[in-house]
Design a protein with these regions (language model features):
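Short-chain dehydrogenase/reductase
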Residues: 141, 159, 175-176
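Acidic, glycine-centered active-site loop in nucleotide-sugar glycosyltransferases
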Residues: 172, 177-180
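A generic "structured core" feature
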Residues: 99, 137, 155, 159-161, ...
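Conserved catalytic-core motifs of eukaryotic protein kinase domains, centered on the activation segment
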Residues: 104-106, 170, 186-188
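C-terminal segments of enzyme domains that contribute to small-molecule binding surfaces
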Residues: 2-11, 113-148, 180-221
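Flexible, glycine/small-residue-enriched loop-and-beta-strand segment within the central core
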Residues: 43-44, 48, 53-150, 179
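Membrane-proximal basic amphipathic "stem/tether" segments
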Residues: 1-40
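Catalytic-loop Lys-Pro-X-Asn motif of eukaryotic-like protein kinases
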Residues: 144, 162, 172
Length: 221
């Protein structure tokens, strides 16, 4: 764990927990297994499960990332407020240019500007509001340049098409697209979805996953 300490890794190094180079860490950063972090700025209360891969991204706030999830930059940012959370499940894929932000400017006052922070020396939270935590469940794929807004829950197995703006909850195994994003279709039939949900494969340990190669490589409808 990196606790309230600022580190800039100038050269590649490897420990039992993390492979890292050219990163900046600040805050309470916890690694629960091996991960690969490259060219990132990571600040706040952030936890990584095993085998997380993050490249060229910015993370700030209260964020948890499940095992085997990957986040790719450049220009990818995941941000929460001091009181909010972003929770990302296991086996998720987040592409370049994705913006995930748990809070917004307050716009029902005289100015939407951060006037409290920048003029009256108040904490940033004075100028922000949230519709709630952002929850991204297991096996979600978020395409390039998507925006995920405050209070959204993206359910297991969903796919978010590139360039979408997600302003409301996404149903399990849905494919959604657009601004604002709307459901295009389901990935699979209800029978297949029931089979996958019953299997709970995202909870399997790595040895069981490897023993069931055909389960994962099989095309489904």
């Amino acid at each position: 764990m990196i606790n309230n300490f600022f580190i800039c890794f100038k050269l590649f190094f490897e420990t039992g927990r993390v492979k890292s180079f050219f990163n900046i860490f600040r805050g309470k950063i916890k690694f629960y297994g091996k991960s690969i972090i490259q060219e990132c700025k990571i600040c706040g209360n952030i936890s990584f499960s095993e085998n997380v891969k993050i490249n060229n991204s910015f993370l700030s706030g209260n964020i948890s990332i499940g095992r085997f999830s990957s986040i790719n930059g450049p220009n990818t940012s995941i941000i929460s407020s001091e009181s909010g959370n972003v929770k990302i499940g296991s086996f998720c894929s987040i592409a370049r240019g994705v913006q995930i932000q748990e809070f917004n400017h307050k716009f029902n006052r005289t100015s939407s500007y951060y006037i409290g922070q920048n003029i009256f020396n108040k904490p940033r939270i004075f100028d922000t509001e949230s519709k709630g935590d952002i929850i991204i469940e297991d096996d979600v794929w978020i395409g390039a340049n998507c925006i995920i807004l405050s209070g959204v829950k993206i359910s297991r197995g969903a796919i978010i098409a590139a360039g979408s703006v997600v302003i409301k909850d996404v149903a399990p195994y849905s494919i959604i697209a657009g601004v604002p994003a709307k459901q295009i279709k389901k990935r699979f039939s209800e029978k297949t979805i029931e089979l996958l949900e019953k299997s709970k494969w995202w909870t399997w340990d790595i040895s069981k996953i490897k023993e069931n190669e055909q389960f994962f490589l099989k095309e489904r409808s």
